[in-house]
Structure formats: structure tokens, C-alpha cells
Amino acid sequence: MAQLETRTEPMVVNFGPHHPSMHGVLRLVVTLDGENVIDCEPVIGYLHRGMEKIAENRTNVMYVPYVSRMDYAAGMFYEAIVVNAPERLANIPVPKRASYIRVLMLELNRIANHLLWLGPFLADVGAQTPFFYIFREREMIYDLWEAATGQRLINNNFFRIGGVACDLPYGWLEKCIDFCDWFGPKIDEYEKLITNNPIFRKRIEGLGTIQRDQAINWSLSGPMLRASGVSWDLRKVDSYECYDDFDWQIASEKEGDCYARYRVRVEEMRQSLSIIRQACKMIPGGPTENLEAQRMSTEDKKSEIFGIDYQYVAKKVAPTFKIPNGELYTRLESGKGEIGVFIQGNNEVTPWRFKIRAADLNNLQILPHILKGAKIADIMAILGSIDVIMGSVDR
């Protein structure tokens, strides 16, 4: 009996931009052959707000409150990079205590970022219960931020050129250590629930595999890069702030799939806890903000800015602080990867050019490549493993 020939035509399906699994206003134009993905085109720009142009029309002090709106899960990281750029361009020293406080805030933000990724990612693949456990711990981080900065999730407005806005309140370090004591066993609890769960592992192992060479060629960074066997972390490579004072390890895996990216982020939370514990014990005294370094002497009235025996004299950032002539690119390691700022000054209070490099924009570019050949049901798991926030992608 002769069989009838069947002819199939590709079907184009729109995912988003209004769908909770899109993690923001992301639209995916997916071409399907049955249940197989044969092409994918991400459509971005729905949340573009001109953050770079705003920076070029504001002083640095005026711009810091804006930046946490780009990535609500990484507000401290963007505050840090926005003040690091003019600091390095103007060679402004940062007091040691201020640098330690910055590290504490950045590592707390790294844990909060990974928790905010982990809860929705598990919900995307069908595990709803850990979502509520994870948000319980995030609230404790927000309590610490509220005590130190006055705000919880965004608009902390804590970083300043030359330091931070204010010192830590009395008892804050003890509360931070209490959080570390509480959160360490909770990570073990997550791993018991999730890491070796056979359903979870079968669901995401082997999905969205990125080889080492592909990760490098696509300019990936953060957990996306380290999960593919590249041990690259800007905290070690660039040695910014005071990370060289601490003993910690770079978290990396070799498989390059969704499961490896999950393992990297869980291990990073452990390493961040270790850094926070060390910083709380080793934090020195002294001022928390500086624009001048002077040596005071009763015999010699001369001031020596970079002398050996000097003390920092705290001074608020003047609204007329002029960004010197020159250009510079500075970067740091956020929870999603490398974020950077290219700044070009022309001796004015506002920068002539302010270019922002968002980690999740670069990481998102590989999505069409790793989706080809996947099943339609795996799109959400692969997209979720990348960790994108559309506010920083579109800017």
C-alpha cells in the first residue's frame, strides 16, 4: 500500500514580550519544525530608557540613584562601577574601610542576585517549593541593606566617589555575621532539595551546552563563562577594591550546560559567604569617604597628598567635581558577569561619553545558537539559565 507523502511547513511562534517566563519584556520569535526549534530571534529594546544619555547630562552624584533601576537585582554593582570610573580617571584614593564596606555590599548583592535567579529558574522547570524558601533569605539581605543605606531593593544611593555615603551603623557587622551563620546551612538545604534531585537533573542536564571555545568567542562572562570550564573572575584578574585581602576560590564547572551553570552559582554563594565573614573580621577603622589625603604635622605645615604618613580627611563630593580629560574603561564582576563603563571626560562636571557594558546583553546573544535543535519545552529552561534582566539589556 502506497504511503502518502506529508509535507510540513515551519511555524513561527512569538514568546513574550508579556509572559512571566520571559523575565522581563523580552520577545522571542521562534521558528519551529514540529516541537524542534530551528531558529530563534530575540527582539529587545522594549525597556530602553536612554541611561547612557542621562549619564552624559548629570553629574556623578546625581546619576548614582538612577543606575539601580537598570538591573534591580544588581543595584550595588552598577553603583560601584559608576563611581569607579571617575575615581580611576581622577586617581582618587579610597580609604581602606570604605573599600571593605563596598566589598560587603557587593557580596551581599551577589548572593541576592543568585537567589533571585534561582527561585524563578526552579519555578520555570517545575519546582515551586524552593521559590518561597529562597525569598525568605533574600529578605534578610534587604534588612541589612535597609539598616546601612535606608533602602531595600533599589535606590540605595550608597556608593560615592572616594568611598561610601556613610559608615555602617552600630551592630551591623554582628547582624551580618548572624546572617552568614543562618544562610550557610540554608545552602546545604537547597542542595539536598535540588542538586541531586533526579527529576531536576534529568530536566536540565545536557540542555543548552556551551563549549569552552564558544563561550570565549561569544564574549560570555560570569557563571555563563565559568560553567564552560574557563576559570575567569575579575575579582581575581583585576584585583579591584580589596579582594586580594581575602582567601577564596573561583567557582567553575566543565560541562557547560544548564546544570553546570546552576552548580557555579550555588558555589559562588558559598564563596561570597566566606568573603563576607573575612571582611567582617578584618575591616579596619578610619573614614569611609575621601577626596583629599593630607599629612598633618605640627612641625611641617605642608600637605603631602600621597605621602607615607598621612591621614584621610573626609570631604563630601562637591557638585562641581570635574571629570578630568581622558578616557578609561573600568570593569567589575557582578552576579551576571562583567559589567563595565567606558568614560570620556573633558574637564567638565558631566562626562562627554558614558558607555555601559551590561553582562546579560552579551550573554543573551548566544541564545539563538544554543536553542537550535532544542525542544520547545526546553526554551524556558535554557533562557532561565542565562539570567537576564531586561532593564540592563535594553538600558
Curated annotation (Swiss-Prot):
What SUPFAM superfamilies would the database entry show? Answer: HydB/Nqo4-like
List cellular component terms (GO). plasma membrane-derived thylakoid membrane
First-tier enzyme category under EC: translocase
Where's it found, cell-wise?
A: Cellular thylakoid membrane
Annotated GO biological processes are:
photosynthesis, light reaction
Look up the EC number in the record and give it.
7.1.1.-
Enumerate the UniProt keywords alphabetically.
Membrane, NAD, NADP, Plastoquinone, Quinone, Thylakoid, Translocase, Transport
GO molecular function, a single term: quinone binding
Q: Give the catalysed reaction(s), semicolon-separated.
A: a plastoquinone + NADH + (n+1) H(+)(in) = a plastoquinol + NAD(+) + n H(+)(out); a plastoquinone + NADPH + (n+1) H(+)(in) = a plastoquinol + NADP(+) + n H(+)(out)
Its main localization is membrane
- A Pfam family assignment: Complex1_49kDa
Q: Which PROSITE patterns match?
A: COMPLEX1_49K (PS00535)
Membrane-related topology note:
Peripheral membrane protein
Superkingdom to which the source organism belongs: Bacteria
* InterPro entries from the UniProt entry: NADH_Q_OxRdtase_suD, NADH_UbQ_OxRdtase_49kDa_CS, NDH1_su_D/H, NiFe-Hase_large
What NCBIfam families has UniProt attached to this entry?
PRK06075.1, PRK07415.1
Family (UniProt): Belongs to the complex I 49 kDa subunit family.
The entry describes its oligomerization and partners as: NDH-1 can be composed of about 15 different subunits; different subcomplexes with different compositions have been identified which probably have different functions.
- Report the protein's function: NDH-1 shuttles electrons from an unknown electron donor, via FMN and iron-sulfur (Fe-S) centers, to quinones in the respiratory and/or the photosynthetic chain. The immediate electron acceptor for the enzyme in this species is believed to be plastoquinone. Couples the redox reaction to proton translocation, and thus conserves the redox energy in a proton gradient. Cyanobacterial NDH-1 also plays a role in inorganic carbon-concentration.
Q: Can you name this protein? A: NAD(P)H-quinone oxidoreductase subunit H
> Which organism is the protein's source?
Prochlorococcus marinus (strain MIT 9301)
